[in-house]
Amino acid sequence: MLMKTTAAHAPASQGTSGIVLDSLRVAYHGNVVLKPLSLTIEPGEVLALIGPSGSGKTTVLRAVAGFVQPAGGRILIGDTDVTHLPPYKRGLAMVVQNYALFPHLKVEDNVAFGLRAQKQPKALINERVTQALKTVGMSDYATRYPHQLSGGQQQRVAIARAIAVRPRVLLLDEPLSALDAQIRHNMVEEIARLHRELPELTILYVTHDQTEALTLADKIGIMKDGSLIAHGETRALYHHPPNRFAAEFLGRANILSAIALGITEVPGLVDVSCGGAVIRAFSQGSHHGYNKLLCIRPQHLSLTPRSAYSNRFNATLQSVHWQGDLTHLLCDVAGETVRMVLTHVNPLPRVGDKLALWFEPDDAVLIEV
């Protein structure tokens, strides 16, 4: 019920506010569950925190919401230190996976609940409710009860209730995990549209679903064992992950043994010995002679060169799996298994065929072991 209270009593926002976590630390009964974490979410930004169960991502969100008392560090929303403020004074709203709608109230009354708790004028309440329901595409369902709605519709109502109070910050705690795949896909598109319509809203989105994070977030933070192990702009983090865990958690990745040979004349590219060949790959820094790992996404491999600078691996096809629009190939490259995903392959290669796997230098990333 506290989660309802947060949205209900969040004071109306003026302007935009970001979130700053300054060495935030959380411990339960002396056991540290969140190691000192510093992170800035810019005003109007969508940041997705992802990670496996128990990684600490929900702990971060609950600390920002005010449901968990930090053992150290500070939490700022805008210019206000909210570390020791109760949830209802933080100017935020929260949406959780079980919707938390009042079953005895109509949709319009659920959406109006927070505004009435704020003792807003009736005319303003009606205006905000109408606008919020329109924003989430639920105007025609205003007089229905929650049990008359699908799961996706109930989640839209929960989001409408949250945005109706005009919070500075919106917290989303795995809001789509209880929905089936198709409805979840549609809701991801709806949340993306919502943020386009409300660009001033700062969103912290916690999920274990990489697709949701990649679709919605301006930036992504990856959690593991209570630590933030990677953080950056979504595209950059996907294409150039800093470590193996980030590479494999944020989409499929081929991880191959490699040795850095030295820098090249092209900034950011290094010569690498990998897969029985000397290739060029992207690197965050200058490396020479160190054992490294090479990360290549399956979809970045092709059977034909894309440029005069394309890298090449010689491979033997191990298996072919046709899945409609996509064909998955497993290949042996110098004793290591490499997966590739292709579209419009005709004719299909056969198991045992010798193949050349091509990829661009910037699509191969040197990472730490």
Swiss-Prot record:
Entry keywords, A to Z: ATP-binding, Cell inner membrane, Cell membrane, Membrane, Nucleotide-binding, Transport
Record protein name field: Putative 2-aminoethylphosphonate import ATP-binding protein PhnT
PANTHER family the UniProt entry points to: SPERMIDINE/PUTRESCINE IMPORT ATP-BINDING PROTEIN POTA, SPERMIDINE_PUTRESCINE IMPORT ATP-BINDING PROTEIN POTA
Function of the protein: Probably part of the PhnSTUV complex (TC 3.A.1.11.5) involved in 2-aminoethylphosphonate import. Probably responsible for energy coupling to the transport system.
Pfam families: ABC_tran (PF00005), TOBE_2 (PF08402)
Chief location category: membrane
Name of the encoding gene: phnT
InterPro entries: AAA+_ATPase, ABC_SmlMolc_Importer, ABC_transporter-like_ATP-bd, ABC_transporter-like_CS, AminoethylPonate_ABC_PhnT, Mo/tungstate-bd_C_term_dom, P-loop_NTPase, Transp-assoc_OB_typ2
Compartment(s): Cell inner membrane
GO molecular function: ATP binding; ATP hydrolysis activity; transmembrane transporter activity
Signal peptide residue numbers: none
Residue ranges of domain ABC transporter in the record: 19-250
Annotated source species: Salmonella paratyphi A (strain ATCC 9150 / SARB42)
Record: residues binding ATP: 51-58
UniProt GO cellular component terms: ATP-binding cassette (ABC) transporter complex
Domain of life: Bacteria
SUPFAM superfamilies membership: MOP-like, P-loop containing nucleoside triphosphate hydrolases
Taxonomic lineage from the root: Bacteria, Pseudomonadati, Pseudomonadota, Gammaproteobacteria, Enterobacterales
